[in-house]
Amino acid sequence: MMSSSKETAKSLIQTKSRSSIRNMFDEVAPTYDFLNHLLSLGIDNYWRVVAAKKARKQLEGEREPKILDVATGTGDLAASMAKIPGAKVTGYDLSPEMLAIARKKYPNIEFLEGFAEKMPFDDRSFHVVSAGFGVRNFEDLAQGMKEFHRVLKPGGCAYIIEPMIPRNAVMKKLYLIYFKNVLPKIAGMFSKSTFAYDYLPNSVEQFPQAEAFTKILKNAGFKKAEYFPMTFETSILYVAMK
C-alpha cells in the first residue's frame, strides 16, 4: 500500500495534470483543515496573517480594494484578506469539494471554481492576488503567474505563500525527515488519501525556491519580486509588484 501511494505521488509530480490535482484535493477535503493545522502545529495561520498584514499596508488609502485568492482551498487565506477594511474578496479554486467547505465556513465571501492558468476575470481587475500553499500544484506555473499579472491592476501586488526547504544543513535534515517519514504516517491515521501526503514533500522539493521563483515572477511581467523566509525557513512569502 505504501509503495503504491509513493508511486502515485511520483506520477502526480511528473504530470501535474489538472484533473489529477483536482481529484486529489477533492479526496483530502474532509480532513484538510484538521491535518493542515495539526501537521504545521498551527503555524500555518500565522503565515497567512503575515501575508494579510503586508497586503493591508499596501492597500492603505484604497476604499474598496478588490482581492483575488487563487488556490483558495477551504478559504482560510481569503478570510484573512477579508479582514482588510473595505475589501471585497473572491476565492478561486479548482476543487469543488474544497470550495463546498469554504462556502460553509465563510458565507460572506464569494467562491468560484476554475483553473489558475485561464481565469475568467478581466485584465486589471484586482488590487491584490494572493495564494497560500497552492501555486506549486499548477500544471503550468509560468502561465499561472502570467495570469496573476494580467488580472492585477497597475501597482497591484501578488502575495504567495509556499513551504520552503531550509537552507541550514541541520534544519534541512530535520525538516526532510519530518516531511518524508513522519508527516505521511500521521496523515495516514486520519486521511484515506495517503498519497496526497507523499506528494506534498516531493512537490516542495521540486518547486523552484527563493531566487528561482522570483525569476519566474519577473519573467511573467512583474517589475519587482522579493521573498521573506518565515519560521526558520520552513515557509516563504513572495511579494511581487506589477
From Swiss-Prot:
Top-level taxon of origin: Bacteria
Pathway listed: Quinol/quinone metabolism; menaquinone biosynthesis; menaquinol from 1,4-dihydroxy-2-naphthoate: step 2/2
EC numbers on record: 2.1.1.163
Pfam families in the record: Ubie_methyltran
Keywords carried by this UniProt record: Menaquinone biosynthesis, Methyltransferase, S-adenosyl-L-methionine, Transferase
One MF term in the entry's GO annotations: demethylmenaquinone methyltransferase activity
Enzyme class per UniProt: transferase
Protein residues bound to S-adenosyl-L-methionine: T74, D93
One GO biological process term: menaquinone biosynthetic process
Catalysed transformations (reactions): a 2-demethylmenaquinol + S-adenosyl-L-methionine = a menaquinol + S-adenosyl-L-homocysteine + H(+)
Protein family membership: Belongs to the class I-like SAM-binding methyltransferase superfamily. MenG/UbiE family.
Reported function: Methyltransferase required for the conversion of demethylmenaquinol (DMKH2) to menaquinol (MKH2).
Protein name per the record: Demethylmenaquinone methyltransferase
Classification of source organism: Bacteria, Pseudomonadati, Chlorobiota, Chlorobiia, Chlorobiales
